[in-house]
C-alpha cells in the first residue's frame, strides 16, 4: 500500500508545503511546518488533480500548498497569477497547467481587495507600509494598534510605525499589493492586500518583474481545472 501523497498539516495551523518534485521514479514530498522537514518517497508522481481529489472535503479552506517543482523551474515573469477571492486561493500557471496553488487572506469587509487585472508597479524585498501600522507615544508605548496614517493622529513625541510587508509587489496606486503576511484558511483578514505565506511570496517574488500581470477575480478563473464541466442541455 503506497503512502498517501498529501501530508496533513500540523495542529498548530501552520502552512504546509506539498511539493511535487521532478524525478518521478523517486518522488519526495517536503513538508515545511514550524521548521520541521519530513520526506516521503513514492513510486508515482501525484498531480494537481490528485491534490484536489485528496482535499475534496476541505478545499479551498486548507492551509496546504501545492507546488510542482518542474513547472516552477519553467515559470517566467509572463506566467499568469490568479487570485480568487471566493476561494481565498492563489494560483500560478505555467504552460496552461497549475504550477502552484496556495492559501491567501485578502481584504476584509470595508477594505475589500479590488477585482481586476493589474500589472506589478513596484517590487521591494523589504517594505514598510506608509498607510497601515501602529502608533507609539514618546515612551514607545503603543497607543493605536491598527493605525491608518491618513486618519489617526500621532501624539507629540510619538511615531507612526509602518507594518512590515516582505516580498512586496505593488498592484494599485492606493497601496494594494501582494506580500508576506499572516494567512488563515478561507479568511479575509487584510486591509486590502493579498497576504501570502512567506515561502510562496518569496517564490513569486523571484519569478515576477515590474509589469507582470496579476488577475484578481471573485470566482475561480476559467482555466482552473477544478471548475465543473458545462452541463448538457
Q: Where are the predicted features?
A:
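A broad, low-specificity signal marking well-ordered, structured residues that form hydrophobic/aromatic
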Residues: 24, 81, 102, 118, ...
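Polybasic, lysine-rich low-complexity intrinsically disordered segments
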Residues: 2-3
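Bacterial N-terminal signal peptides
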Residues: 27-36
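Exported/periplasmic cell-wall-interacting domains
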Residues: 39-46, 111-115, 134-233
Amino acid at each position: 500500500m503506497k503512502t498517501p501523497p498529501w501530508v496533513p498539516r500540523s495542529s498548530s495551523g501552520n502552512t504546509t508545503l506539498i511539493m511535487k518534485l521532478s524525478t518521478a521514479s523517486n518522488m519526495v514530498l517536503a513538508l515545511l511546518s514550524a521548521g520541521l522537514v519530513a520526506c516521503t518517497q513514492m513510486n508515482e508522481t501525484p498531480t494537481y488533480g490528485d491534490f484536489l481529489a485528496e482535499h475534496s472535503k476541505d478545499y479551498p479552506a486548507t492551509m496546504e500548498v501545492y507546488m510542482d517543482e518542474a513547472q516552477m523551474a519553467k515559470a517566467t515573469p509572463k506566467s499568469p497569477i490568479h487570485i480568487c477571492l471566493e476561494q481565498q486561493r492563489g494560483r500560478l500557471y505555467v504552460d496552461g497547467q497549475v504550477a502552484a496553488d496556495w492559501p491567501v487572506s485578502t481584504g476584509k469587509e470595508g477594505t475589500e481587495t479590488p477585482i481586476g487585472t493589474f500589472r506589478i508597479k513596484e517590487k521591494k524585498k523589504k517594505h514598510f507600509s506608509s498607510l497601515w501600522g501602529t502608533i507609539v507615544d514618546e515612551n514607545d508605548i503603543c497607543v493605536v494598534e491598527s493605525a491608518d496614517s491618513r486618519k489617526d493622529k500621532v501624539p507629540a513625541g510619538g511615531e507612526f510605525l509602518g507594518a512590515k510587508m516582505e516580498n512586496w509587489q505593488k498592484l494599485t496606486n492606493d497601496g494594494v499589493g501582494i506580500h508576506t503576511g499572516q494567512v488563515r484558511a478561507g479568511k479575509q483578514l487584510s486591509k486590502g492586500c493579498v497576504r501570502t505565506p512567506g515561502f510562496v511570496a518569496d517564490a513569486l517574488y523571484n519569478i515576477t518583474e515590474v509589469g507582470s500581470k496579476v488577475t484578481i477575480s471573485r470566482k475561480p478563473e476559467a482555466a482552473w481545472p477544478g471548475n465543473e464541466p458545462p452541463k448538457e442541455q
